[in-house]
Amino acid sequence: MGNSYKETMNLPKTDFAMRANLPENEPKRLAKWEEEKLYWKVLEKNKDGKPFVLHDGPPYANGPIHIGHAFNKILKDFVIKSHAQRGYYTPYIPGWDCHGQPIEHMVEVTLGPDKMAAIEQPTLRRLCREWAEKYVDVQREGFKRLGVNADWEHPYLTFTPGYEAGNVEIFKKMYLDGAIYRGRKPIHWCKSCHTALAEAEIEYSDETSPSIFVKFKLDSIPGVFEAAGVDGSAYVLIWTTTP
């Protein structure tokens, strides 16, 4: 038998794995973090440090996480972990928005338009709550899989009585401070959902429209055309794409 060329080469000799093997190793690492209660250990280590609190704008609990969720949560995790490594006290309480059109829309898709039109409001609210509860759990596991450190067992949920009561108290304070007033403002309205829409909820699609030039004949006022040196009729020319 010939000599093995492997024995003639200066190959690296280390216990460090040559492959990351992330599909297998990442879940093990995350399980170890959870078993060791890493989030709480970091807080305990930095308990006397200067507080750094990142208020988490909540995602809607209306479906599995997507790349937008990942981008949002990973960037926040970068910021929080970097501050923790510098000695800051960094409690991170995640939350979910459990109200709103995105959740109701998913329930409507599930029921279909006929059942949705006939449903009673208490039943609709119950179904929306159940949908939100389901996807809070689904998204929580997705965020954990991204390696985000947080107090996942005690999130804030906007449909809990305590959270809703807090909103009422803050609204009362805003009213007493003169920040609430009645006025007029144009709003976007969804005729199928029967609800007002925020500007961020409006999606515009590209559309090909005709380009039209139109001339409008001006009514003659005695002496005006003559003074302007116009002999005969005068017109105003317009261009539009929305006939």
Give short role names for the model-derived ranges.
Residues 2-243:
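N-terminal, positively charged nucleic-acid-binding surface of large information/translation enzymes
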